[in-house]
Amino acid sequence: DVCSSDLIAMIMGLVLPTSGSVSVLGAKIPEQRYDVLGRMNFESPYVDMPMRLTVRQNLTIFGRLYAVEQLRERIDQLAVDLDLKEFLDRSNGKLSAGQKTRVALAKALINEPDLLLLDEPTASLDPDTADWVRQHLETYRKTHNATILLASHNMLEVERLCDRVIIMKRGKIQDDDSPERIMARYNRDTLEEVFLDVARGRVREGAPEDAP
């Protein structure tokens, strides 16, 4: 069964689909993945950066991988935007969980991607830090006209950040629409309630008899 993390891996060309095809930013994946990798980036709390390197060193490495022009200035700007200045020259292994979250977001934004892939970006974060992440994601999306693909079990987060929602269960799409239309179709007030209905196999009055 395909999970949301597998979907992200397929978009990045790291996993091949068993059937069908993948097209991202006008490019066929994986055949043309290197044509568009520079326009994408990825962030997950489950992927850590080298512990012994400083924040600046880590961002420099990733910036060079993405061939970022004026890299030093870009890192300095991210340090201001994401409040990294106090620990920019501290090793990653000595950072708090909240500081690591800021660095991970800086890494994901280092190349100003057109497509930002996020796998449970606020998992295990305290409410204040999670809200901070969401605010910055909203700001980035609006200021850069970027597309964000978010894989999350946090339906409050999905409602806040997403214009289009795809609900998956055991690798199959159960619904695909705007949050408002999905909630109306299931006669529910929140996506959390819809998510629980789908997970538990319930079909509410007004919900689709056959998933799309």
Language-model features, listed with the residues they occupy:
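Short, small-residue-biased leader/transition segments that mark boundaries at the very start
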Residues: D1-S4
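Conserved ABC ATPase "signature" region
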Residues: T60, R64-F87
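Conserved catalytic motifs of ABC-family nucleotide-binding domains
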Residues: E112
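Catalytic Walker B motif of ABC-type/P-loop ATPase nucleotide-binding domains
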Residues: L116-D119
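Helical segment within the ABC ATPase nucleotide-binding domain
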Residues: D131-T143
